């Protein structure tokens, strides 16, 4: 993950990496929960890496139970804007295709900071909202990913 982020920023200083996610439910998904915790433990070993936890809320529709991730998007948007206000960074890299981050992206630009939208996936899933408001867009390619893989 750090190699991916460092390749993304190039020769610029990497201030911090924030990863926003909701932990899985230990009772309903015990095996996946353990795997996720192992993954988190590996990520915690990376210098400057922060895991910001949201939550999963249980929902039911037509007799089917499903979970919705909550708070991660709000936490990310707040951190983008508040860190820009606090002069913590000059450039932020937003790795998400969630168009609702366009408001936070505009807020960052109001503080005279650059925000780079990092688009992953094919052009059909790219957020045109983010693309239109970001300072610039960087497309992740297969070659970029291949260069970041660990060499064994």
Annotate each PLM feature.
Residues 1-68, 114, 121:
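Domain-level signal for Mg2+-assisted phosphodiester chemistry and nucleotide/NA-binding surfaces
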